[in-house]
Amino acid sequence: MGKKINPLGFRLGANQSHRSIWFAQSKSYSRGLQEDEKIRDCIQHYVEKNTRISSGFEGKGISHIEIQKKIDLIQVIIYMGSPNSLMEGRTRGIDELQTNVQKEFLSVNRRLNIAIIRVAKPYAQPTILAEHIALQLKNRVSFRKAMKSAIELTEQADTKGIQIQIAGRIDGKEIARVEWIREGRVPLQTIRAKIDYCSYTVRTIYGILGIKIWIFLDEK
């Protein structure tokens, strides 16, 4: 039976870096992981809630969240396609987000600092593309049309290849199946190939669908 490794973990130290940077003793390690998960979930829910009003998809979502922890400071860096979409009509957008996250994990001894960085090529980010596909699937667009539109967006970002996989009750069929499409090269077994990856779930009226995206960015 084939064993598939996570493409990001496979390339750690070569061309990928950790997205949580901290050290903890073995007894408190699980608590640190749970804290990271709470921070990411809180930020994700806040962004979804406050950017839902904007019409159309323009690569506005979160690419990834990096968390750096020190003794007295938690530094959270949010990489977004369009930070302005979060700040539209909100004079204290980051401060409000920071307050919400601070309330979530109630850390008195450590300060929380949140920074938002704009991603240069949002359509080269698999998470943003997965959100784009998920939005179309929720609106009952054909899965093939949704995948092809995502491929067209990646062509604007000068990527070398992309592979998209959707699994579940596609188009409301009774039997779950897996559909995928590939454009260009996606060398998953080449460590020097810089490949970005995400796994995303979307809840539709027919059930939950799983979306996986691999993007081949460059080769070093």
From Swiss-Prot:
Keyword Chloroplast in record: yes
GO CC entries: chloroplast; cytosolic small ribosomal subunit
Domain of life the protein comes from: Eukaryota
Domain KH type-2: 43-120
Localization annotation: Plastid, Chloroplast
Keyword Plastid: yes
CDD domains from the UniProt entry: KH-II_30S_S3
Alphabetized UniProt keyword annotations: Chloroplast, Plastid, Ribonucleoprotein, Ribosomal protein, RNA-binding, rRNA-binding
GO molecular function list: rRNA binding; structural constituent of ribosome
Chief place of localization: plastid
Signal peptide per UniProt: none
Transmembrane segment boundaries: none
Example GO BP: translation
Subunit (UniProt): Part of the 30S ribosomal subunit.
Record-stated family: Belongs to the universal ribosomal protein uS3 family.
Name of this protein: Small ribosomal subunit protein uS3c
Lineage: Eukaryota, Viridiplantae, Streptophyta, Embryophyta, Tracheophyta
